Amino acid sequence: MSGNSLGKLFCVTSFGESHGPAIGCVVDGCPPGMPISTQEIQVELDRRKPGTSRHVTQRREPDEVEILSGVFEGVTTGTPIALLIRNQDQRSRDYGNIAETFRPGHADYAYWQKYGIRDHRGGGRSSARETAVRVAAGAIARKWLNQQYGVVIRGFMSQLGPIEIPFVDWDEVGRNPFFAPNASIVPALEDYMDELRKSGDSVGARIDVVASGVPVGWGEPVYDRLDADIAYAMMGINAVKGVEIGAGFSSVAQRGTEHSDEMTPEGFLSNNAGGVLGGISTGQDILVSMAVKPTSSIRLDRRSIDKQGDAVVINTHGRHDPCVGIRATPIAEAMLAIVLMDHALRHRAQCGDVSCATPKLARLAPSGVQRVPAPPR
């Protein structure tokens, strides 16, 4: 199986399955000399780990990270950093009824047709369990980005099923299990999820991520465009079916006079581009939004086929997230951090000594308008 690595100069390669002994990753390309500890990585993992509320899977995984290499006396050495998270709460018996059948909407059928073999326990490699190691790698990237450039990356849920969540305050994001930036709407989200869980069905979500403090100049103009790599990384997250940068699909209804971000000596007047023009960062906030589909594993009867091609009716037992989007915010933040660190190193390697006489604009003029405020520093 290829396609398990992301990045060029900062490269993350993950391994492991949902019900295997462990999951992990190798982070290659981190510069030497940066202090890093398991405690710092654990903070991010704890934001994502399962079993933290009644609205997510009740699989109890502590997600305790081990640093196996690449760090000596608490400092990165410049060699590959190996991270390991041991699986401790697998319950493979829950998946016995799908060993010979395929769950509608899941990767089961596609994996079977491609490889001729699949690990049906918890979805194997296709499980969102693997995203824990992406969060661990992202913790390294976001610390380096913040130390070197002051970059701050934060995300939030902007929609749960049919319920849109207006942005109010960054401080609210960490105070509820939905990563919702609006305290007043949390009771409605809880009621909705309680009813959904009772029904046995699932639902999708929309996650927004903002990177503030990204310097102008990161990214490449053609195939390795910054926005293209961001979209590639986000689409690599389990269950993600759509990604927007800036105004995204709403730009279809805009006119050029509205969409183009005017510039003044005081800064940009808007940020419809989402901080990227021509594949290169503008110095404005990077604005990313992604759509997460409903969980495919549900306990309601669904029509499918078995390995012989015969019609069957299946339902899925086990401990599943009724909305995988609830825990997706830390994952999206991590993926954005990994892409940005990779491009930061690439820019430094090629254009580190480039200077330009034109002043760098403020990311937003005092009179400028942006849908989502920048994260607090």
From Swiss-Prot:
Transmembrane segments: none
Cofactors (names): FMNH2
Entry's cofactor comment: Reduced FMN (FMNH(2)).
Residues holding FMN: R125, S126, S127, N238, A239, G278, K293, P294, T295, S296, S297, R319
GO molecular function, a single term: chorismate synthase activity
Pfam families: Chorismate_synt (PF01264)
GO cellular component, one term: cytosol
InterPro entries: Chorismate_synth, Chorismate_synth_AroC_sf, Chorismate_synthase_CS
One of the protein's GO biological processes: chorismate biosynthetic process
Function recorded in the entry: This reaction introduces a second double bond into the aromatic ring system.
HAMAP family for this protein: Chorismate_synth (MF_00300)
Protein family (similarity comment): Belongs to the chorismate synthase family.
Protein name per its UniProtKB record: Chorismate synthase
Organism this protein belongs to: Aromatoleum aromaticum (strain DSM 19018 / LMG 30748 / EbN1)
Chain's gene name: aroC
